[in-house]
């Protein structure tokens, strides 16, 4: 991570940390860096989610892009993976998404995609950061015909929807409950599943700029669980604010997380001989029960650091086609280059339809170990140094010794927020509470803000 870029772009409280001034500079400097090798006029696609700050930051970002001669295609409200898809298939120079994903409405973020549809690598981000930190802006300032132009491109949304539909099958007879988080999926998920002939019900589809992720979506699936039970739905599908992740709910109203979703899709692909190298890429946060289920099926796993960008890096490097995170980021590289909640939802319903199995039956093949995650608010400059605090390092070592290999502990900084995350897995809820609470108490005493 750099000074400005975290694991998922630049994020902060809108108009306080992520200001219009910074958005303008990101547009100007980011656009310049990403268009250096273009022979024709560069084209950049820009989209946003439904946050009230989105239009403010969009306007500033676009102004910065136009100031270095870039032709900007304004997509409006669109899922993050929609930007990735359109950049790649329409041969644009780059794409930019304005969103803070699952964060609350007061936050926002800006992330860039290269011409290949992948998120920027560290080197490109450092180039942009160097320009941000320069004492003087020495970039060219074209005038008249050298300035960029702005093109409204609402048809991009429908192109993404049609692509999504092309990856699925007819869902006639399937009752699907959708929670679009009052976010970007509001613009597309309903249309996609209607076109696939599903019998749908929808919540979280009334965005007002302030209610994105507020009690709805993949981080708050309780309303969706109730809806599934009340309506007798076959499946519930909860997206986050920018629709790059999915959490599912089975017909009994039980949560099916990213680990179980990856297992279901991975086993389906493996059985068909379509899982590249018979391997799923996952992170250190994946559940031990997921690992055991993969071992039982003879499916290999590759483990990365937390963050979908690291999953994607490993997939690209080694030629894998399925990977993701417990949080619901699932990357299906046969179709798209980034986590895509709606694509994942379509593939999950396809497995149900083709196998004739209920989601609960498919998910029951993974027995999840009790896991507890506690977020502790700390100073941003301390979250990466926590393990250097002797008392914290000592208590973690003590708890790991007590586990004696029957469980695990993971303490790591958030890539996007001023938080230290303490996670443990163990055979019982009582044990996992003990391990996490003991460590968390020491962290709070030593460096916590609350």
UniProtKB/Swiss-Prot annotation:
One Pfam family, please name it.
PGM_PMM_III
**Entry's Gene Ontology cellular component terms:** cytosol
Instruction: State the source organism's domain of life.
Output: Bacteria
What EC number(s) would the UniProt record show? 5.4.2.10
* Record carries keyword Isomerase: yes
Q: Which residues carry this modification: Phosphoserine?
A: 101
Recorded hits in CDD domains, A to Z, give: GlmM
The protein's UniProt keywords, in alphabetical order, are: Isomerase, Magnesium, Metal-binding, Phosphoprotein
**Amino-acid positions noted as binding Mg(2+) in the UniProt annotation, renumbered to this chain:** 101, 240, 242, 244
What catalytic activity is recorded?
A: alpha-D-glucosamine 1-phosphate = D-glucosamine 6-phosphate
Q: How is it modified after translation?
A: Activated by phosphorylation.
Q: What class of enzyme is it?
A: isomerase
Q: Which is one GO molecular function term here?
A: phosphoglucosamine mutase activity
Q: Identify which residues the record assigns to the active site.
A: 101 (phosphoserine intermediate)
Q: Which cysteines are joined by disulfide bonds?
A: none
Q: Which GO terms describe its biological process?
A: carbohydrate metabolic process; peptidoglycan biosynthetic process; UDP-N-acetylglucosamine biosynthetic process
Could you tell me what the cofactor note in this record states?
Answer: Binds 1 Mg(2+) ion per subunit.
Q: What does this protein do?
A: Catalyzes the conversion of glucosamine-6-phosphate to glucosamine-1-phosphate.
Entry's family note: Belongs to the phosphohexose mutase family.
What protein name applies here?
Phosphoglucosamine mutase
Q: What is the species of this protein?
A: Streptococcus agalactiae serotype V (strain ATCC BAA-611 / 2603 V/R)
Q: What is the lineage of its organism?
A: Bacteria, Bacillati, Bacillota, Bacilli, Lactobacillales
Q: Which gene encodes it?
A: glmM
